[in-house]
């Protein structure tokens, strides 16, 4: 897809068929369908009183929310009295190419379980629930109005083939549809396979992804002066987010923001 041919219309979003807008007849029949087959909470399975909320009230309350005290730079949860003007303890002494990273949940407990089911359990349908959580957070924070393009962190083609989908792509698509934003699914390419970041130390994570991403040639002019939202499932050390942002800034992006469903807690203040 070239920048000139990309569209902000949801119909242009390369999402799975169930993410597209359904025909009028199906929409008309939807109340009867929901009455016969009520939706269930994605976390505990109980029938939902309010459709399209994905979580029952109890599970929604029990999710490990980052809360109002978060680092304004990397998005990690911090104490209520933490000094974060220059970042938190986990990020203030690091160079980060992105302007800000945000996440509604901590990567623990039920959030970790759902994300692992999503990408490793191949539960692509969870993109709707997790994308809705992230979308609610972006809407409340106002960040959805601060970007021009939405781009997923790309997977290497071998990993995408084995998994069947790129979880970041599905989340990015949910956000593009909800906020009517321009989706750039092929803005970045992963140039080489990398080790799974989970078992690596912070320093090794940075080395692992350094040089792993590139801006695709058709976007070299389309990204100039744009504010880009990079989307992924989990923010751990920020190595992947930093490398993606570094490539985009080098390509002329005005600003890069990062949005993930969950954040691994690292800061002590």
Model-derived regions, located:
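Glycine-rich phosphate/pyrophosphate-handling loop used in enzymes and phosphotransfer proteins
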Residues: 1-269
